[in-house]
A protein has these predicted regions:
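All-alpha amphipathic helical-bundle segments outside canonical DNA-binding/catalytic cores
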Residues: 89, 128-132, 149-165, 217-222
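Amphipathic, non-transmembrane alpha-helical scaffold segments
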Residues: 20, 62, 66, 70, ...
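Amphipathic alpha-helical segments used for helix-helix packing
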Residues: 104-127, 177-184
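Amphipathic alpha-helical segments that line or abut small-molecule/effector binding pockets
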Residues: 21, 88-117, 134, 160, ...
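C-terminal peripheral helix-coil segments that are non-catalytic and often amphipathic
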Residues: 1-3, 97-100, 104, 134-150, ...
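Amphipathic alpha-helical linker/stalk segments
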Residues: 2-7, 65-94, 131
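Short coil/turn segments at alpha/beta junctions that flank glycine-rich nucleotide-binding fingerprints
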Residues: 29-33, 84, 105, 150
């Protein structure tokens, strides 16, 4: 590889973007423990020396990758407008958009799982996580509140807890789908199987918050019937 000095005329911003993009691919496929700085340098066409100039350690670079990905995901999600949709359709669209991010960026699943193993410390080192997620949950809360106001959702839903439940269920096919598909009669590997899972979980979540929920509504949702 051609030697590159810190004094290169390349734009520092472009260099950092290239490093972070390459690191995201490596961390997303190999995890924090398995990724090597040599491979990141090779992928982005820079030297290890230059990477260490910007990031003092592999852990610091990982922290930058996960925090940037998290922020990018939030900014994209809150950029959607749901106010023109009826509450039920807004709810569906919101969660479909969450799932779609993981479909388009499969490396995010590994980054999320890896960061969970490290108890979220890398998020907290680089950003205040809660301040980033507050606008996202507020957007979700508005959908729930509009549904409650029109009588299609139960009132007084804890938006934070319900968002956590919804996120966990909808993204399960990306986080643990390979394992679950191996020993259960479910398909979370193919595009059609993922789409079916996302629709199924959204149906269950809707059944839980609809005023007419009760046993019959939940039973239909468990059977995969749209309610």
């Amino acid at each position: 590889m051609r030697s590159e000095t810190i004094g290169t005329k390349r734009s520092p911003r472009a260099t950092i973007a290239a490093i972070v993009a390459a690191a995201g691919q490596e961390f997303g496929s190999r995890g924090l423990a398995g990724a090597r700085m040599e491979d990141i340098a090779r992928r982005c066409g820079r030297t290890k020396q230059l990477i260490y100039h910007y990031y003092g350690s592999k852990e610091e670079l990982f922290a930058e990758v996960v925090s940037r990905n998290h922020e990018a995901a939030i900014l994209e999600l809150i950029g959607h407008d749901y106010d023109h949709l009826e509450p039920v359709e807004a709810f569906r669209a919101y969660l479909h958009n969450v799932a779609d991010q993981y479909r388009r960026f499969p490396e995010w699943a590994m980054l999320t799982l890896d960061e969970n193993l490290h108890r979220g410390v890398h998020y907290n080192e680089r950003r205040k996580l809660r301040s980033l997620t507050q606008p996202l949950v507020a957007q979700f809360r508005r959908v729930l509140d509009r549904g409650a106001a029109t009588g299609v959702f139960n009132p007084d839903i804890d938006a934070d807890k319900f968002y956590a439940a919804a996120f966990s269920m909808v993204t399960a096919c990306f986080m643990t789908g390979q394992v679950l598909s191996e020993y259960l009669a479910v398909d979370m590997r193919t595009e059609a199987g993922v789409a079916e899972w996302v629709d199924y979980t959204i149906g269950l979540l809707l059944a839980a918050i609809r005023p007419r929920a009760g046993a019959e509504s939940v039973k239909l949702a468990l059977q995969g019937v749209t309610i």
